[in-house]
């Protein structure tokens, strides 16, 4: 779902205002199961604005936030036994004050970022198109889905990156009734990822040196200052296994497994394969949902390993690869327990969702030895109250808080004093200073909906998040949207 365009439908109109269905949200990655996500259809079109601003960067590579506006449409339709869904959106905005990062989709391609010491704001445009279809008989269910996300990121002052991203997701799934209304399902998914990048300098006084980062403050020294045209090429395979009641009530079990691999290739060095990485990920979900309450246990884990290719002397402009070194590892696990209690009062609805989580993350670089360990506990509480007022109006009020409390943290940076450039060491220390300390987030939501007639409605929604970090650092996120519902 597009997070910038809030669905903003009154709980009297839409079941997703209940928090119960989100307890089993991982199950809906199987398109055969997604036809039971909502009991009724809906469509909306709207425009939104988002401002995400931090007074000083928590992570220098992510900068001080983002400002963007968005227009989009979503639909989820039911006809007899069939279900169709889809969405399309366009986003335009600016990523603010990014440093040591001239690459996009950092969470996808790290640690193999291309960087310089200048950085700055980056303009961005994003496009998304997605759709899916599912159907069922008495004993069988099936579904398919497809989505494509594209992005353009650039800067009009030196250094001048231009990044074009593309992400294609295709999945197909099926399910068989096993007992009562329970269906056992399986789905297969494929993802293709591509990012093409180039950096230009037009200042006649000289150019800034480009670095190819390799993790935890290190960089590939041999190719520093070269390779300003490059691309990332990745593929992901995934499988999902489910046990799900078509009524949406009862025990729900989901296991999602995936493997993603990608290469970083320097185009202007005869497509030299500089780096390779793989990411194995697992997500397990067990939930029990009743009419007015539910409980869920979630476990997620991943292992990411990165490799640096070693090359001999170039012959006729071609570098022969002579070795591959496994130099970077990032391993993480997270457990969470959450529950929902909800109750209706006439046309009003109240729900409360407490949760507690624990996460472990360990990043390692082999030589020089670098290591960051962060273990943290994250309790949270969220509540919503929805009620009618005046004629044909409805209001939703939501509030929540998350508290991130590190219980163990370690950092080791061998040879930091001799590392060049020193800005990369500062980058790692800066990120650790925030990740190893507490932070507290408060969330608020207000939405107003009005029925125009039996077919149409309008919705206005505003969200505000405030996160307080150490060093008098704070983040403010404001999201607003105006939607037409039909």
Provide a role label for each language-model segment:
Residues 218-354:
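Long, internal scaffold/assembly segments composed of regular secondary structure
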């Amino acid at each position: 779902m597009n997070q910038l365009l809030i669905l903003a439908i009154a709980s009297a109109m839409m079941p997703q205002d209940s928090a119960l269905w989100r307890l089993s949200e991982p199950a809906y990655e199987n398109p055969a199961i997604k036809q039971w996500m909502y009991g009724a259809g809906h469509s909306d079109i709207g425009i939104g604005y988002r401002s995400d601003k931090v007074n000083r960067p928590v992570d220098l590579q992510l900068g001080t936030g983002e400002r963007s506006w968005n227009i989009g449409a979503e639909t989820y339709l039911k006809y007899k036994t069939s279900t169709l869904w889809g969405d399309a959106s366009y986003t335009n905005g600016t990523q603010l004050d990014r440093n040591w990062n001239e690459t996009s989709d950092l969470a996808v391609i790290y640690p193999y970022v291309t960087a310089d010491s200048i950085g700055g704001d980056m303009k961005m445009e994003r496009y998304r198109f997605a759709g899916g279809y599912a159907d069922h008989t008495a004993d069988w269910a099936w579904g398919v889905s497809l989505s494509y996300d594209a992005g353009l990121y650039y800067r009009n002052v030196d250094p001048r990156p231009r990044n074009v991203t593309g992400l294609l997701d295709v999945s197909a799934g099926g399910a068989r009734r096993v007992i009562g209304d329970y269906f056992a399902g399986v789905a297969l998914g494929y993802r293709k990822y591509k990012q093409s990048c180039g950096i230009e300098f037009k200042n006649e006084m000289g150019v800034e040196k480009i670095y190819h980062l390799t993790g935890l403050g290190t960089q590939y020294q041999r190719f520093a200052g070269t390779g300003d045209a490059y691309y990332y090429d990745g593929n992901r395979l995934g499988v999902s296994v489910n046990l799900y009641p078509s009524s949406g009530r009862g025990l729900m079990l989901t296991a999602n497994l995936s493997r993603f691999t990608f290469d970083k290739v320097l185009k202007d060095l005869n497509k030299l394969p500089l780096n390779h990485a793989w990411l194995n990920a697992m997500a397990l979900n067990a939930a029990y949902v009743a009419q007015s309450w539910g409980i869920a246990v979630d476990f997620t884990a991943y292992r990411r390993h990165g490799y640096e290719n070693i090359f001999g002397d170039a012959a006729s402009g071609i570098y022969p690869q002579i070795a591959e070194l496994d130099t970077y590892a990032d391993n993480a696990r997270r457990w969470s327990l959450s529950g929902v209690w909800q109750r209706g009062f006439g046309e009003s609805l109240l729900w409360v969702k407490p949760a507690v989580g624990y996460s472990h993350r360990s990043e390692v670089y082999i030589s020089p030895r670098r290591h960051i360990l962060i273990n943290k506990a994250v309790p949270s509480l969220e509540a919503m109250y929805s009620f009618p007022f005046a004629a044909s109006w409805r209001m939703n009020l939501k509030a929540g808080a998350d508290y991130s409390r590190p219980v163990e943290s370690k950092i080791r940076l061998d040879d930091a004093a001799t590392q060049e450039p020193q800005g990369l060491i500062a980058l790692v220390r800066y990120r650790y200073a925030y990740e190893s300390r507490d932070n507290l987030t408060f969330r608020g939501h207000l939405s107003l909906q009005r029925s125009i007639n039996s077919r149409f409605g309008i919705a206005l929604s505003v969200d505000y998040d405030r996160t307080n970090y150490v060093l008098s650092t704070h983040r403010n996120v404001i999201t607003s949207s105006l939607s037409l519902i039909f």
